[in-house]
Regions:
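N-terminal mitochondrial targeting presequence
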Residues: 1-121
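Conserved core segment of the aminotransferase class I/II
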Residues: 112-119, 123, 181-184, 203-210, ...
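Conserved PLP-binding catalytic core of the aspartate aminotransferase-like
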Residues: 124, 173-174, 180, 474-486, ...
Length: 595
C-alpha cells in the first residue's frame, strides 16, 4: 500500500481533480471507503505490505533482478493500491517483463473457494474499514528499508553501508540517550529493593516511595484507577496550572493514557455518531499526521481536509477553515476540529493570533477542538513560542472560555523521547458531565494504561527541582537534548534550502522538516510509467541509492500537483551531517538524470 498513501479511493482522486482546478481545494474521505471502490480497486486494497514484500522477494528470486530493479518493483507494488490504471493481463505482463509480475492479481490475495473451505474468516468477510486503513510512516518503503538492512548483514553489496531511518520520530532509536532521573525513578518503582541502595539519589527515592504508596498493594504490578493513578493525575493538574500561568486545572478532568494515540482514538470513538442521517466529520490539517486518517477510516468517520498555508510557514487561515467546513456540510456533519501544534509533519509553531482565530471558528460553528500538543517542549525558533489552547481560550474570556476542548501530551516527544514506554495524558475541558461520564465508562472498559507509562508521566510533569540532588544532572541532560535538536533543525533547513528545486520552511518546532520539491517532468513521467506517485518514486530512489529512508509527502496529504517529503531531524549530529551530504549528492544526480 504505497507508503499507506492517503488518496487511494476513486472518490478521493475525483476530489483531487476538482481541487486542482479550484482555488479552494478540499478532500473529503468517504465514511465507508471500500463501498465506493470498484471491484478492481477493492481487490487492489487486499495487497497488504506483507503480501507486497513476499511477492517482491519471490519475484527477485525467480528473475535474478538487480537491486535497482528491486527498488522499482517494490515501489510499483507500493502504489498499486492507489492507482486507477487498469491492471494488465498476465499475457501482457509476460510480454512486457518476460515473466509473471509478483503484483498481478494473484490467487493468494483472493479468497478462492478452496481457501473459503479451509478458513471461516477470509479477506472477504472482515471489516472493510480495516482493509482500507492507511498509515504512511510504517508502509512498504520502511519495510524495504528493513529488507535492505538484512541484506547488508548478509554481505550483499550496496552503495552504502547502513540504512539511516529518518522516517519516524523515534528519538532513542536515532541515538538519543534516556534522561537519568526518569530511568532511576522507573527502576526504583519496579524494583523497590533498590530503595535501600546508596547509588540512587534521595529525591528520586522519595518520588518512588510516593508513587508506590499510591499503587494498590504498594506495587506497580497492580491495576490502577481506569483514569490513572490519582496521585499522578494531581501532579499533571499542577503541571498544567503552572504551564498556563495559573489557569485552574481539575485533576478529575485528567485521563492517563498509553501515549497520546489511545486518548485520541477514545475521543474519536465517543464522537462517532450519525446525526440527521449524516456521518460525523472530523476536520484535519493537510499535511496531517496519518494517525488521524487511519483512525477515521477504521471507524467509518468522514475526514474533512483543510489546507495549511505553506507560503505562510504552514500557518492556518480562518477563511480556509470556513471553506472546508461549508463544503463538508453538504456530505457530513463536521463536529471535530483537529489542530497539531507544533506541527507534524510541518514543524511550524502556531502564533497566538492563529490560535485565537481557530477558537473563534470552532465556537461559531459548534465544534469541539482536539489540540494535539505533544511537541510543546520542542520549540527552536527564537521568534516562536508555544501557547496552549487552554490558556489562550481562558485569556480570551467571554463565551470562548466555554469552548469544548481536549488536549493531549505524551512522554514520547519533548526532551524525554520515551516512545516505547507509552505514557501520556489528555485533559477534557468544558465537556458535558453526562458525556464525560460515558467517556469514563468507555475508558473503564479498557481497565487502565500501564503503570510504567503512568510513572513516566509523573517524571515528565514533576522533574527534579532546584536544590534537589538530581536537579543539576537533569538540567544538563535536558538542555543537551533540546540544544542538539535546535542545532539539527538549523542544519537541515540550511542544507536543504541549497538544493535545486527545493522550497523549505524553517523548522520552528517539533522534530520534522517537510520541504516542497520540484520534480522534473521526465521523472514524473517515469513515475507514472511505474504506476507510482512522483514523491514515492523519489523516495525509493533515495533509499536504494543512499540508504536514507524518508516518508513521501503523499502519505500526509498535499495540494494536488505539489510534491513533498517528511524527514526527521533526530539522527545524531554527525550522522545527520553525513545524511545531508549523501542527500545532496543524490539530489544533484537525480536532477541531472531526469532533466
Amino acid at each position: 500500500m504505497s507508503r499507506q498513501l492517503l488518496r487511494g479511493t476513486s472518490l478521493q482522486r475525483a476530489a483531487n481533480v476538482v481541487a486542482a482546478t479550484s482555488s479552494r481545494p478540499m478532500v473529503i474521505q468517504p465514511a465507508h471507503p471500500m463501498e465506493h471502490r470498484s471491484p478492481l480497486q477493492q481487490q487492489q486494497c487486499k495487497l497488504t505490505p506483507s503480501i507486497v514484500i513476499r511477492r517482491w522477494k519471490s519475484f527477485l528470486h525467480n528473475n535474478n533482478s538487480s537491486a535497482q530493479t528491486a527498488a522499482a518493483t517494490t515501489a510499483e507494488a507500493a502504489t498499486v493500491t492507489v492507482t486507477a490504471t487498469p491492471r494488465r493481463s498476465q499475457a501482457e505482463t509476460l510480454n512486457a517483463r518476460g515473466s509473471h509480475s509478483p503484483f498481478d492479481a494473484p490467487s493468494r490475495c483472493m479468497s478462492t473457494k478452496s481457501q473459503n473451505n479451509m478458513k471461516f474468516v477470509t479477506i472477504d468477510n472482515i471489516n472493510a474499514n480495516f482493509k482500507a486503513m492507511e498509515y504512511a510512516v510504517r508502509g512498504p518503503i520502511v519495510i524495504r528499508a528493513g529488507e535492505i538492512e538484512k541484506e547488508l548483514l548478509k554481505g550483499v553489496k550496496k552503495p552504502f553501508d547502513r540504512v539511516i531511518r529518518a522516517n519516524i520520530g523515534d528519538c532513542h532509536a536515532m541515538g538519543q540517550k534516556p534522561l537519568t532521573y526518569l530511568r532511576q525513578l522507573m527502576a526504583l518503582t519496579m524494583e523497590p529493593r533498590l530503595l535501600n541502595s546508596p547509588e540512587y539519589p534521595e529525591d528520586m527515592k522519595k518520588r518512588a516511595r510516593d508513587l508506590l504508596d499510591a499503587c494498590l498493594g504498594g506495587s506497580t504490578g497492580s491495576y490502577t484507577d481506569s483514569a490513572g493513578i490519582e496521585f499522578v493525575r494531581r501532579q499533571v493538574a499542577a503541571f498544567i496550572e503552572k504551564r498556563d500561568g495559573g489557569v485552574p486545572c481539575d485533576y478529575q478532568n485528567i485521563y492517563l493514557t498509553g501515549g497520546a494515540s489511545p486518548g485520541i482514538k477514545s475521543v474519536l470513538s465517543l464522537l462517532n455518531c450519525t446525526v440527521d442521517g449524516k456521518t460525523p466529520g472530523v476536520m484535519v490539517p493537510i499535511p496531517q499526521y496519518p494517525l488521524y486518517s487511519a483512525s477515521l477510516t477504521e471507524m467509518g468517520m468522514t475526514r474533512v481536509d483543510y489546507f495549511l498555508d505553506e507560503d505562510n510557514c504552514w500557518g492556518l487561515d480562518r477563511k480556509e477553515l470556513q471553506r472546508s467546513y461549508n463544503e463538508a456540510k453538504k456530505q457530513c456533519n463536521p463536529r471535530v476540529l483537529v489542530v497539531i501544534n507544533p506541527g507534524n509533519p510541518t514543524g511550524q509553531v502556531l502564533t497566538r493570533k492563529n490560535i485565537e482565530e481557530i477558537i473563534k471558528f470552532a465556537y461559531d460553528n459548534k465544534m469541539i477542538i482536539m489540540a494535539d500538543e505533544v511537541y510543546q517542549a520542542n520549540v527552536y525558533d527564537k521568534n516562536s513560542k508555544f501557547y496552549s489552547f487552554k490558556m489562550v481560550m481562558n485569556e480570551m474570556g467571554g463565551p470562548h472560555r466555554t469552548q469544548e476542548l481536549i488536549s493531549f501530551l505524551s512522554v514520547s516527544k519533548g526532551y524525554l523521547g520515551e516512545c516505547g514506554i507509552r505514557g501520556g495524558y489528555m485533559e477534557v475541558i468544558n465537556m458535558c458531565p453526562d458525556v464525560k461520564a460515558v467517556l469514563t465508562k468507555s475508558i473503564t472498559a479498557q481497565l487502565c494504561s500501564t503503570t510504567a507509562g503512568q510513572i513516566a508521566v509523573s517524571a515528565l510533569v514533576n522533574p527534579p527541582q532546584p536544590g534537589e540532588p538530581s536537579y543539576e544532572l537533569y538540567e544538563k541532560e535536558k538542555s543537551a537534548v533540546l540544544g542538539a535538536l535546535k542545532e539539527r533543525a538549523k542544519l537541515v533547513y540550511d542544507t536543504l534550502s541549497t538544493f535545486e528545486g527545493y522550497t523549505v520552511n524553517p523548522v520552528q518546532g517539533a522534530m520534522y522538516v517537510f520541504p516542497k520539491i520540484e520534480i522534473p517532468a521526465k521523472a514524473v513521467e517515469a513515475a507514472k510509467a511505474k504506476k507510482m506517485h512522483p514523491d514515492v518514486f523519489y523516495a525509493f530512489e533515495l533509499l536504494e541509492t543512499t540508504g536514507i529512508c524518508i516518508v513521501p509527502g503523499s502519505g500526509f496529504g498535499q495540494i494536488p500537483g505539489t510534491y513533498h517529503f517528511r524527514s526527521t531531524i533526530l539522527p545524531q549530529t554527525d550522522l545527520l551531517k553525513e545524511m545531508m551530504k549523501k542527500f545532496g549528492v543524490f539530489h544533484t544526480e537525480f536532477m541531472k538524470k531526469y532533466q
